Curated annotation (Swiss-Prot):
Its cofactor is Mg(2+). Its EC number is 3.1.-.-. Its main location: nucleus. GO terms for biological process: base-excision repair; DNA replication, removal of RNA primer; double-strand break repair via nonhomologous end joining; gene conversion at mating-type locus; maintenance of DNA trinucleotide repeats. This is Flap endonuclease 1. It comes from the Eukaryota. Phosphorylated. Phosphorylation upon DNA damage induces relocalization to the nuclear plasma.
């Protein structure tokens, strides 16, 4: 699910922390990718012309394999070395969220049964998409044959991706879930595995710039995210994103906010603190997640196992042999050529000061107003 409203807060208060770039900008980078999130995207987006999932002659779903194979090739073509991280066992605190998701599935199944148009059926079918154990195992087999490293995290994939980035094994964590920032990955890449046809730029979010720009410690930032709404527990009812940020900046922690509300000083009867609220446990899952120490992980990209890959994709899954062989050639070329060094690897990056961040944010707001005024003038001339 991620963190509700976090992207909007960062976009408004620290726009300079989000850099929008073409995939070519990440040439020479190693990236840890949230595999479970990617597989979900592929199952949703990689479809036949009639809107149904891709299947082979035996009726087995192949959308996830098609997406994994070709999106990985696209990264390799652009000089990126991807590694994938799969979810392990979900934390116990996530059981409430998983129960809610199961309830929503039951409701969606009812709506699907009642749907009268093909468009409505397709809409409900996509809401029922779920990454299964079999999908994960098939994707892991594919990656192994491609020579692309993957890791099965003890619990949350995003936490393990962040750990790899923090220990310098990769440049960034890639996921659509904004909660990846709570694990303090140096950089979060969003939209990396999107289809090229979408023409959506990759959003690179700098965690340190976010913290500096919001003037929050990582502990306060995590508390803000819990207040906004995360997968681990409920948030205070009646408190929206704007108020949540204001409360954290004023009081500094959830403990102080709870005291403020319970004392009656807030004069707001609409704010309701959840009963037995496990925010402290949620906080620790973000600040001290269960991960494999990044220093103990050795990521290795190997030549693809050409014969086995053709057997798996073409013989078993009925992919086009011509296209698969072409893909293997691209893969061999990309992995063999290695990764050239980047110029910025020779220089120390100096963090921006609060004054520089404020100036950048001011410039961004001024440019926004200027563009609005230009649009008004253009419309007036018409």
């Amino acid at each position: 699910m991620g963190i509700k409203g976090l992207n909007a807060i960062i976009s408004e208060h620290v726009p300079s922390a989000i850099r929008k770039s073409d995939i070519k900008s990440f040439f020479g980078r190693k990236v840890a990718i949230d595999a479970s999130m990617s597989l979900y995207q592929f199952l949703i987006a990689v479809r036949q012309q009639d809107g149904g999932q891709l299947t082979n002659e035996a009726g087995e779903t192949t959308s996830h394999l098609m997406g994994m194979f070709y999106r990985t090739l696209r990264m390799i073509d652009n000089g990126i070395k991807p590694c994938y991280v799969f979810d392990g066992k979900p934390p116990d605190l996530k059981s409430h969220e998983l129960t809610k998701r199961s309830s929503r599935r039951v409701e969606t199944e009812k709506k699907l049964a009642e749907a009268t148009t093909e468009l409505e059926k397709m809409k409900q079918e996509r809401r029922l998409v779920k990454v299964s154990k079999e999908h994960n195992e098939e994707a892991q087999k594919l990656l192994g044959l491609m020579g692309i490293p993957y890791i099965i995290a003890p619990t949350e994939a995003e936490a393990q991706c962040a750990e790899l980035a923090k220990k310098g094994k990769v440049y960034a964590a890639a996921s659509e879930d904004m909660d990846t920032l709570c694990y303090r990955t140096p950089f979060l890449l969003r939209h990396l595995t999107f289809s090229e046809a979408k023409k959506e730029p990759i959003h690179e979010i700098d965690t340190e710039l976010v913290l500096r720009g919001l003037d929050l410690t990582i502990e306060q930032f995590v508390d803000l995210c819990i207040m906004l709404g995360c997968d681990y527990c409920e948030s205070i009812r009646g408190v929206g994103p704007v108020t949540a940020l204001k409360l954290i900046k004023t009081h500094g922690s959830i403990e102080k906010i709870v005291e403020f509300i319970e004392s009656g000083e807030s004069n707001n009867t609409k704010w309701k603190i959840p009963e037995d609220w496990p925010y402290k446990q949620a906080r620790m899952l973000f600040l001290d997640p269960e991960v494999i120490d990044g220093n103990e992980i050795n990521l290795k990209w190997s030549p693809p196992k050409e014969k086995e890959l053709i057997e798996y994709l073409c013989d078993d899954k009925k992919f086009s042999e011509e296209r698969v062989k072409s893909g293997i050639s691209r893969l061999k070329k990309g992995l063999k050529s290695g990764i050239q060094g980047r110029l910025d690897g020779f220089f120390q990056v100096v963090p921006k000061t609060k004054e520089q961040l404020a100036a950048a944010a001011k410039r961004a707001q001024e440019n926004k107003k200027l563009n609005k005024n230009k649009n008004k003038v253009t419309k007036g001339r018409r």
